[in-house]
A protein has these predicted regions:
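Rhodanese-like catalytic fold shared by cysteine-dependent sulfurtransferases
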Residues: 4, 16-30, 57-142
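Flexible, polar/low-complexity N-terminal or interdomain linker segments that lie immediately upstream
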Residues: 7-58
Length: 142
């Protein structure tokens, strides 16, 4: 009976993991906020495109696309990316809520991968833009 319970638990665990959707980014594609803030402060962003895929462009120098869970904003992102070289470093962020709940970062990052961008990054804001950027006094758009 004990073995049957263990096997049932393993099967349930495997099934639930298979049902969970994988994030479209790798850990190596997460950019630390301190690194981006340093690059902005030291004016080392000439080769970098920073894109907000959430409700507001807060990070200094970022382009406001709008929430990409909305199809029209995802299409706006697609159009914005048309003239950007595929090897250009692109950092996207949202920050509306914790990563696990964010409706915007997954479709936007998946689009970057679909379009073949080789140097795409996701700004690592695991909690939200306030906690992980604003409260640290990192550079913002005026």
């Amino acid at each position: 009976m004990k073995y049957l319970f263990i096997i049932a638990c393993l099967v349930c665990s495997i099934f639930s993991q298979a049902q969970q959707k994988q994030d479209p980014w790798k850990d190596s594609q997460l950019m630390d906020p301190a690194l981006l803030a340093s690059r902005i402060e030291n004016q080392k962003t000439n080769d970098l495109v920073i894109i907000s895929v959430g409700p507001e462009a807060i990070v200094k120098g970022s382009v406001d696309i709008g929430p990409t869970h909305e199809p029209e904003n995802l299409e706006k992102l697609r159009n914005y990316l048309k003239d950007i070289p595929k090897n250009r470093e692109i950092v996207i962020y949202c920050g509306c809520c914790p990563f696990v709940k964010c409706p915007n970062i997954r479709p936007a990052f998946a689009l970057l991968m679909e379009l073949g961008f080789k140097n795409a990054k996701l700004l690592n804001l695991p909690k939200n833009i306030k906690t992980d950027w604003l409260d640290k006094n990192y550079p913002t758009n005026d």
